[in-house]
Amino acid sequence: MAQSFRIENDSMGTIKVPDQALWGAQTQRSLINFAIGHNKMPMKLIYSIVQIKASAAIVNCRLGVLDKQRKNFILNACNEISNGMHDEQFPLSVWQTGSGTQTNMNVNEVISNIASHLNGNKLGSHEPLHPNDHVNRSQSTNDVFPAAIQIATVQEILENLLPELDQLIETFDKKIIKWNRIIKTGRTHLQDAVPLTLGQEASAWKEQLIASRNRLNKSLNELYPLPLGGTAIGTGLNAPAKFDKEIALEIAKSTRSPFVSAQNKFAIMASHDALVHTMSQLKLLAVSLFKIVNDLRLLSCGPRGGLGELRLPENEPGSSIMPGKVNPTQCEAMAMVCTQIMALDSAVTMAGSGGHLQMNSYKPLIAFNLLESIDLLSSACKSSRILMIEGIEPNLEKIQNSLQNSLMLITSLTPIIGYEKASKIAQCAHEKDITLKEATKLLGYLNEDDFDRIVNPQSMTGMEN
């Protein structure tokens, strides 16, 4: 059956729009002009724009530039969109105008047409709400779109990423307590080093994550000042007095986050340094997670031909040709996510540096990469915690064998017999394939009782008490 269309008008003239679509002429032009790739504008960003539209309607009504009836029409439409009733009405590609204008107008048009439908008017009639004159009143894409990126980024970090990160930290904390008396061989340069406990080793992972969490939390402070009320370039043209402060208060109330009106709107409309900074903190979290999963797959490598000090949960077969093979797939998935985050950070850095004069025209890319990064990190942290980290168990036999055979235990003798003699003991033990105690006795440097008293792995970890 052939699709039916209605005719809509905008400043460019007439255009056919699918009869059932709630979007209008400008959205339809964007669908035609930017049929690029398959990445759609994230719904999280759409919902943040809708939050702005609702808050703007409330403030515009309060300041006397929008009547109460139209305010309620806007709020009703925004409520429907926020509840997920119209997700399919936001079909635009990320790869569009660098300001995000088409997406802002997509939201304006859908709100207008929801009101038209609810009031028995034809779609596209702009009655009772005009997309520009009423829904977009006191606003410009140039202040709405970056504000929406900031709001969506803050909400996604607070509601999704930080809770997952906290649970991951808590899981490592439980492992630290459980593993704190398991003494093992430390390794530097991938070679044997002095001993530490498995709990101490895990504490490094935990502290890396805590530092990343703290850095992320701190970066949010730069995202709370909003450019709303700056309109086109930061001067506030066509916005009533006090609109900027009032809308920031409304958004702070609805999001329960301390958003405020930016003192200098020119700066955060022409550049997006705060967003670039937050992206860099996501990258640092990825750097930490990459290091942690690399450690885990090194310590678990084997199970018989490698270190094999940790046993990771076995979740699925690992090879189509080698029976019984199981791979550290959660580590690999996390490593790929982290690699992707680092690449997305590079793109956001370049995008952030690409502004010209009063406008940065890479906003959709920044929005997409930030929200994609937060989503990937949140879900990867959850997956690795549930399917791997909670189930990790130490291989005590392997750990003990490696510790007993480590030549670096000799380090504790250095203050007693000196570096050169200690080196000779290690070399002798290695060359003759004997223990350090046997080499010490052979060279005549210490008796067995003194050796046992001084070369004490537990005391070397600082965990005697």
From Swiss-Prot:
Domain of life from the UniProt record: Bacteria
Reaction(s) catalysed (UniProt annotation): (S)-malate = fumarate + H2O
Pfam families linked: FumaraseC_C (PF10415), Lyase_1 (PF00206)
Sites where the protein binds substrate: 99-101, 130-133, 140-142, 188, 320, 325-327
Assembly: Homotetramer.
Further comment found in the protein's record: There are 2 substrate-binding sites: the catalytic A site, and the non-catalytic B site that may play a role in the transfer of substrate or product between the active site and the solvent. Alternatively, the B site may bind allosteric effectors.
Function: Involved in the TCA cycle. Catalyzes the stereospecific interconversion of fumarate to L-malate.
Protein's UniProt name: Fumarate hydratase class II
Organism field: Prochlorococcus marinus (strain SARG / CCMP1375 / SS120)
Gene this protein is translated from: fumC
